[in-house]
Amino acid sequence: MSRHLSGFSRFLVVWFGQLVSAIGSGLTGFALAVYVFQLTGSAAHYSLVLLAAFLPSLLLKPIGGAIVDRYDRRLMMIIGDAGSIAGVAFIIVMMLLGVKSLWPIYLGSIISSVFVALQNPAYKASVTDLLDESHYSKGSGLMQLSESSRYVLSPMIAGMLMSWFNLESVLLVD
C-alpha cells in the first residue's frame, strides 16, 4: 500500500509543478495579448499574440509526442520548461532593452509555445510511469484540472496582476 501512496505522492509533486507551469503559460499568453491590445488598440494584433502563444503547441504536440516516446520523459519535461522559459525571457530582455516593436512578443510567444509541445506530452506520458493503474482515473482528473486552469484561472490572475504591476513583472511570475 505504501508503494501506491509514494507513487501517487510523486505524481502530485509533478502535477503541482505542471499546474503552476500551465497557469504561468496561460498568464503570459493572456497578459501579452492584453498588453499588445493596450499598445496598439488592434484586436487583430491581440488575436495574433494569442495565436502565437497557443497554436504552435497545438500543431506540434503530435511531433512532441513522438520525440517523448524516444527519450527520457523527465529530460523532455525539463527541456520543454527551459525552452518555454527562454521564450518568455527573450521577451523580457527585449522589453528591458527598450525594443518597442511587436516582433519580439510574437517570436518569444512562438518559442515558448513550441517547447510546450514537448513538455506537455512528456508530462502526460509520465503518468503511467508514476502511477499504478488503480490511480489512473485520479491522475487523469487532476491532469484535466491543471490543463483547464490555463484557460480559466490564467486570464483572471493576469487581469488582477496587470492592474497592479507592469507587464515585465507579470511575465516574471511565469
Where would I find each of the regions flagged by the language model?
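Symmetry-related core transmembrane helices of the 12-TM Major Facilitator Superfamily/SLC fold
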Residues: W103, S169-D174
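Helix-loop junctions on the cytosolic side of multi-pass membrane transporters
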Residues: G98, Y123-D129, L171-V173
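Membrane-helix boundary and inter-helical linker elements of multi-pass secondary transporters
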Residues: G7, Q38-L39, D69-R70, G98, ...
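Small-residue hotspots at the loop-to-helix junctions and early N-terminal turns
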Residues: T28-A31, Y35-L50, G141
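C-terminal ends and interior cores of transmembrane alpha-helices
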Residues: A82-V99
